[in-house]
């Protein structure tokens, strides 16, 4: 049973560096999910392409609940994800890695919880209010930082991610407002993904890859082409970072993530 999963974002569509890869289809209360399962250092790892193969699903149409539930069904306890981001912080340059520690949610139309009371399409028919003070698992963040340090990659140990609805890029005014609010980087996929993982008491962390400066900071027109091109340039480093981080993940979970539902239902 795999205990670790990788969710690949924009530009990360294949489980390279894994061996003995097989495809599986997982049925969930929220829909069907296709994943790939392979091995790394003798351990099974699940790979899920967030946008589908070839970036076929836009951020606001991703079935986040099905994706996270599918990983849970497979027995996954820890999730490492990647996110392509625009930078609002001049110190975070294109090509840099950012080990996210905080996020802000500005999405509008997504499904944010598994716990819809009696309307839940599974036997967990209750309402839960999980603590999200620290949205990213400290153990997984530490593993990513240790890996980046060992590999000699340029990385930032902290960063606040602003999640926008998309699929369009942001306006100059939006970026100015986000900067005032304290955002370092901006993207479209961390919400509700990170919160859903917490609701199922799974550990979750994300490494953001800066692909460009955000609107009004960059003097150029923003294009998805530049995102794809930079992610292609960083592709090998991203995969090396994720695999090395897996080596640093402790076997036993000692983080608060595993007890996220304690006290969340009022019982």
Swiss-Prot record:
One of its GO terms (cellular component) is cytosol. Disruption phenotype: Disruption of the gene results in a complete loss of ribose 1,5-bisphosphate generation from guanosine. One of its GO terms (molecular function) is S-methyl-5-thioadenosine phosphorylase activity. PROSITE patterns: PNP_MTAP_2. It is an enzyme of class 2 (transferase). Its EC number is 2.4.2.1. Gene3D superfamilies: Nucleoside phosphorylase domain. Transmembrane segments: none annotated. Pfam families: PNP_UDP_1. CDD domains: MTAP_SsMTAPII_like_MTIP. It comes from the Archaea. Substrate binds at residues 188, 212-214. Keywords: Glycosyltransferase, Purine salvage, Transferase. Coiled coil: none annotated. The record marks 170, 224 as: Important for substrate specificity. Pathway: Purine metabolism; purine nucleoside salvage. One of its GO terms (biological process) is purine ribonucleoside salvage. Phosphate binds at residues 10, 50-51, 83-84, 189. It catalyses: a purine D-ribonucleoside + phosphate = a purine nucleobase + alpha-D-ribose 1-phosphate; guanosine + phosphate = alpha-D-ribose 1-phosphate + guanine; inosine + phosphate = alpha-D-ribose 1-phosphate + hypoxanthine. Belongs to the PNP/MTAP phosphorylase family. MTAP subfamily. Purine nucleoside phosphorylase which is highly specific for 6-oxopurine nucleosides. Cleaves guanosine or inosine to respective bases and sugar-1-phosphate molecules. Involved in purine salvage. Although this enzyme belongs to the family of MTA phosphorylases based on sequence homology, it has been shown that conserved amino acid substitutions in the substrate binding pocket convert the substrate specificity of this enzyme from 6-aminopurines to 6-oxopurines. Homohexamer. Dimer of a homotrimer. This is Probable 6-oxopurine nucleoside phosphorylase.
